[in-house]
Amino acid sequence: MMETLYDNNGTPVAYLDKDDGNTFFLWNGVPVAYLDKDYTVYGFNGMQLGWYFNGYMRDLKGYIVGFNKQSASIEVKASPIKSFKITKPVKRIKQIRRVKPIWKRNNSAICLSQFLANGIN
């Protein structure tokens, strides 16, 4: 099952492939992160990026970085055609999971594409 993720402008940036190890892919097929226990999002480089819970991608401070269609409060754009997936890299040793902050209603200062790019090896 695939779930599209949109940035705070409603542009599709990535998708979560639940059938491929809960991996987040960019539309060009690059695997950038994965969903771990307790809704924690880690990059393949081992960095904790944030959390994905109830359709919202949140940064380490609890601000909204992106969302799925069901959680959208704005009109979202059509998803592009997916490219072939690039082989996933080996997961590096994970950082110690941070304590979840209080969820904020505001958007993060970082865009979803940059947020996910922080997880690339």
For each feature predicted by the language model, list its residue ranges:
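Long terminal segments
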Residues: 1-12, 47, 53-121
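Short low-complexity stretches enriched in small and charged residues
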Residues: 8-17, 21-25
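Short "repeat-start/strand-capping" segments in structured domains, especially the N-termini
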Residues: 1, 18-23, 36-40, 53-56
